[in-house]
Structure formats: C-alpha cells, structure tokens
C-alpha cells in the first residue's frame, strides 16, 4: 500500500479521546489496511500469543531460582543488572500497552458495528411505520381524517360550498 493510503488509514483510525497510533506501529497500519474487518482482533490474538511465549521463556530462564529472582528485583547488585531489569520491565509494559491498544481499537470497531446495526434497525422500523400508517394516536388520526374528508366533500350544513342538483340525465352525461 502506498504512503498516502497508509496516511489515510492512520487518519481513519483516529478517534476522539484516543491517541493516534505511534509512527513505530506503521507495520500494524499496513497489516490492518488489508481490508479485514477483524484486523485489530487478529493482532490482539497475535500479541496475546507472543506474551504467553515470552512469559514461558521468562519462567524457564529462572529455572527454579525464584527466590534469587525475587531478591534480584528488590535490589540489583550493579548498574548493568538494574538496566537489564529495567529493559525487561519495559518490554513487558510495551507488550501490555500493545495488548490494551488492540483491545481498545477492537472494542471501538465493535461499538461502531453495533451503532450501525442499531441505526439501520431504527431507520427500517421508522420507514415501516410511516409506510404502513402506524401511529401512536391511530384512533385520533382516523377521526381527524374522517372529519376532514367530510368537509372536503361538502356536507349539507356547509354554506361555503355551492350545492348543485343534477337530474338523472345530467348525472349520466357528467359521468361520461
């Protein structure tokens, strides 16, 4: 996909109240731009799987030295160990951040789909009611309509409309 297309995709992912995706996630933009509706859901599963693998590797690397690892977290012996611990924690935080970001965008997509479905259903219900004449005051509407129909035809008590009497021969000529 071209750079302009990915920029358009980035603009499409901006949501009020949510930060834009960082530039370092351009690979995610390209993979989500493939047109798959569940792009973020797929990425969420991938990051969850990656997190599980990383957790298993971390547990395997400790190899029974749980007490030593716990002691190392409280007070690292030197600056290099402290930096290594900090890097490890930052990797974990980045993974958590990506997982949460994917969940957030997945939730946003689901909300948008739900809104669209609700709007479509409500517009169909509204159109159906208007086409079939369903109103809340159905009886009042019919009574008012019959009163208007009676006035339009010219009731005998209405002096504003001229009354013409046709003989039977005139009526036949009028109907032809």
From Swiss-Prot:
Record organism: Rattus norvegicus
PANTHER family associated with the record: LEUCINE REPEAT ADAPTER PROTEIN 25 (PTHR46949), PROTEIN FAM89A (PTHR46949:SF3)
Highest taxon listed in the record's lineage: Eukaryota
Protein name: Protein FAM89A
Region feature (Disordered): 140-165
UniProt similarity note: Belongs to the FAM89 family.
